[in-house]
Amino acid sequence: MKILVIRLSSIGDVILTTPVLKQLKEKYPDAAVDFLVMKNFKDSIEGVPYIDNLIFFDKKENDGYQNMVAFGKKLAENKYDYVFDLHSKIRSKIISKQIKLSGAKVLVYPKRKWWKSLLVKMKLIKYHVDDTIVKNYFKPFKKLGLKYRGEQLLFTFSPKDLEKVKEYEGLFVRAPGASKETKKWTKKGFGNLAKKLYEKYNIKTVLIGGREDIERCDHINKISGGVCINLAGKLSLKESGALLSLAKLMVTNDSGPFHIGRGVGCRTYVIFGPTDPDMFEYDEKSRLIYKGEKCSPCSLHGNRECPKGHLNCMNKLSEDIILKEIEKDMENNN
């Protein structure tokens, strides 16, 4: 049996496919499982042992309707029995359609009803997910007898990645970036938290993120009184995962590092504001920090600006709330 799983982006959403892939390979060990992902997100899934062949979608070469049709026809030559489209957007639909013409069965994961999204945009209802992302990923796999068993994520890295970050073992980590401005907790909050943790535990905080987060992390370090180490823009995704595997704990916004941290077993505190925390499940190693304002959640992916202009879900969240959670866990685990 030949199977193609499609999830083109982004970091977290790709990592969230790993529980499905694991169970798929366990139930059908002889099946050939291919995975299609955008080239710029390959580090999110590369090295996962449940995949036989990783296929890259290169936007420079494959984007545009005609190119996507040609790309789909090329994939159809692999003679897949099943295609599981876990992206369910225009690119994956065009590609899947071409493979379907070759005789493959195409199954798509359920997206949110369009009219619910419209009502949220019109500010007539609050945003609420119908189910967790991982549970939704499992739904099209019922055809093959797969059943949801939890969010055991996996993120991999190499010994070389681990060696590069070995010197930061046992430190706290913060990931203050996010794809949208409204999903970012305050710089003051991150800075004050790092300062208070250093005063109590004499442990520094490593700041991680992309190049776009360098200035933000510099500002956070100044607020902390210089007790942070700014590695934003200096680590690859795999190196960030290796760092988190060695970290004492991480505090992050609702962004990719949350799922990387869970995928390497790092104790993680995730801050939610405008987005719905019910997209995921939590356990003793993944803690939810959520103020729960009356107007929250208000969007699926966050916005550039708060629809109400105050962003109270983030601005009113005190570092002391997170500090108390960390102190409690530090006491219980020492």
Per-region residue spans from a language model:
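Catalytic machinery of carbohydrate-active enzymes
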Residues: 1-334
